[in-house]
Amino acid sequence: MVMTDPIADYLTRIRNANMAKHTSVEIPASSMKKSLSEILKNEGFIRDYQVEDDNKQGMIKIFLKYGPNNERVISGLKRISKPGLRNYVSAENLPKVLNGLGIAIISTSAGVITDKEAREKNVGGEVIAYVW
């Protein structure tokens, strides 16, 4: 099967595992997905992730995070820039997700970073996804 949007697949797998209250989820690896996983970990949306090398593409195992009463930490994931309709923003027009409660993940010339980091560095780029 040919996958037309691997980032949407990544977000959907995390969303589905989160809704089913799984402790972890395995996703085919890529450098973009590793960057997204690092951002989710640094922002506190996932517990951890590890890259498992299988001498091919590899897999990323993401360990989901839940609150003390088993409530979900990730309440929403949304793909913004799609292969058929790319969404680019300038540094002045960087989006805020839920008035700063969520994050926007931006692919910039400085790498894949959050909207907060993009504001600090004063760079724009492609809006990959919103997470809240």
From Swiss-Prot:
GO terms for cellular component: ribonucleoprotein complex; ribosome. Pfam families: Ribosomal_S8. Signal peptide: none annotated. The keyword rRNA-binding applies. It comes from the Bacteria. GO terms for biological process: translation. One of its GO terms (molecular function) is structural constituent of ribosome. Keywords: Ribonucleoprotein, Ribosomal protein, RNA-binding, rRNA-binding. One of the primary rRNA binding proteins, it binds directly to 16S rRNA central domain where it helps coordinate assembly of the platform of the 30S subunit. Belongs to the universal ribosomal protein uS8 family. Part of the 30S ribosomal subunit. Contacts proteins S5 and S12. This is Small ribosomal subunit protein uS8. The lineage of its organism: Bacteria, Bacillati, Bacillota, Bacilli, Lactobacillales. The gene is rpsH.
